[in-house]
């Protein structure tokens, strides 16, 4: 049973950073949390962020960020609901760090997206919460 737990444990971690039945949070380092988004919110930033989101994130997080994408059911956990205010309490720096480093089953995007692309995605995510 111990080996099975070790093998399956990482798969039980939710995208929001909590483990089922745990109070452990996925927390960005303080220095990362203080980072400011250098990309101003604009039509072009939102459009770029939406395009990336629809290509890279929608399969799990869903079109409106509700965690109901077509691949969500196959993950074994429920993807974070990005539209329900989960991100409202997090700084842009925290979100940037989480997108950059990832946490299974969410991949890291350190080499998949440029820093500007990651900031554009954050601007787009913020627009989902405002809807």
PLM segments and residue spans:
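Sequence/structural segment immediately N-terminal to covalent heme-attachment motifs in c-type
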Residues: 43-66, 72, 95-101
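Electron-transfer interface patches adjacent to heme c in soluble/periplasmic c-type cytochromes
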Residues: 77-94, 109-118
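C-terminal capping alpha-helices of c-type cytochrome domains
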Residues: 97-104, 110-131
